[in-house]
Amino acid sequence: MVVDADKKELICSFCSKKQHEVKKLIAGPAVFICDECIDLCTDIMKEESKVALKQITASIPTPQKICKILNDYVVGQDQAKKILAVAVYNHYKRLEYVQSGNNDVELNKSNILLIGPTGSGKTLLAQTLAKILDVPFTMADATSLTEAGYVGEDVENILLRLLISAEFNIAKAQKGIIYIDEVDKIARKSDNPSITRDVSGEGVQQALLKIMEGTVASVPPQGGRKHPQQDFVQLDTSNILFICGGAFMGIDRIIRSRTNHSSIGFAANINIDKEKSNNEILKSLEIEDLTKFGLIPEFIGRLPIITTLDELDKEALITILTKPKNAIVKQYQKQFELDDADLVIDYSALEAIAEKALVKKTGARGLRSILEHLLLDSMYKVAELKKQRVTITKEVVDGLIEPCMTSIISTKLNKKQPIIEDIPA
């Protein structure tokens, strides 16, 4: 306890003002702080928050520039890119507006829901957006979450990951992006309320509501379950952008059922609708379809921006293999170069790889595993042999022959080698 020389009057431990010189003196464990020092600390925190926001908002690209950068990494999905670019741009402009103190019009936060098949680029879009904006980013799997008090992960642990990504800079973390994958897996199990508690479905949706809308959450810095004796980090989620994604397998049937409902008795209309692809059907998505699927209305209400991603076709998968900055074939070619080797893949092989991914219904995500399987033995050998050229053909992909390995005549490996051969004009 800090007192003056006569031990009659308490003083502030920070500015040394006496109790009668300030309005309030708040006691803590062996220390005191006055109201003036509290105000000063508050002003410092606000100023730090403004600086962190200015660093972000000053570098926000326009929606068109965001789309252009996304095109370098993500193939196709033009409409989804446009919607995301506008949504993210408006989100961070909103933060700038709120921070300015101008409150004549209240601007609400607009979280985003991405709906699309596995491997269509949902996660990559979210990751690339965070990279473009240079903000803290974290991903969470909704299937690992449960309600507080049950075995599993609390929703607050998502915020802890964001804090870790921001190196525990609270002001920076409060302007970050959180991507929650597999939200379709936390749909309630049926339309009717059950007497048994759905702790990993509707219960998780309920738990996510507050942090998605905006609240000051108590985050345990060590992770794990909360208990009264531990310290907490207070994190305001009002300005955190939440992007949720999911495949929503079967929602196309719900949409078809709704759109066909008014056509009962008119078989021709039903048959026409059946001929539509899933990509076309998803364009007709309505809020009621998500409710029917198992998302509660309150959860959907926290995700006002909803966009669908198309299933990737063979041409798109081939483009993903070769064209983006982080193209999978380019990555493997670089790995071979590091071993003084060369990798060549002809176009027929790329077609066969894309067709395999389509059959497996794994989208772009399955391309790497297919290539890894094809190149495993070659990567095992070239590390010892060196100066080798590995050629992958359609027959190799089909499992008819082994990859062709030949000695490289020229040892000048810094010369650009073709990634693929025989590309159609």
Swiss-Prot record:
ATP binds at P117, T118, G119, S120, G121, K122, T123, L124. One of its GO terms (biological process) is proteolysis involved in protein catabolic process. Gene3D superfamilies: 1.10.8.60, ClpX chaperone, C4-type zinc finger domain, P-loop containing nucleotide triphosphate hydrolases. Pfam families: AAA_2, ClpB_D2-small, zf-C4_ClpX. Residues 1-53 form the ClpX-type ZB domain. SMART domains: AAA, ClpB_D2-small, zf-C4_ClpX. One of its GO terms (cellular component) is HslUV protease complex. One of its GO terms (molecular function) is ATP-dependent protein folding chaperone. Component of the ClpX-ClpP complex. Forms a hexameric ring that, in the presence of ATP, binds to fourteen ClpP subunits assembled into a disk-like structure with a central cavity, resembling the structure of eukaryotic proteasomes. PANTHER family: ATP-DEPENDENT CLP PROTEASE ATP-BINDING SUBUNIT CLPX-LIKE, MITOCHONDRIAL, ATP-DEPENDENT CLP PROTEASE ATP-BINDING SUBUNIT CLPX-LIKE, MITOCHONDRIAL-RELATED. Belongs to the ClpX chaperone family. ATP-dependent specificity component of the Clp protease. It directs the protease to specific substrates. Can perform chaperone functions in the absence of ClpP. This is ATP-dependent Clp protease ATP-binding subunit ClpX.
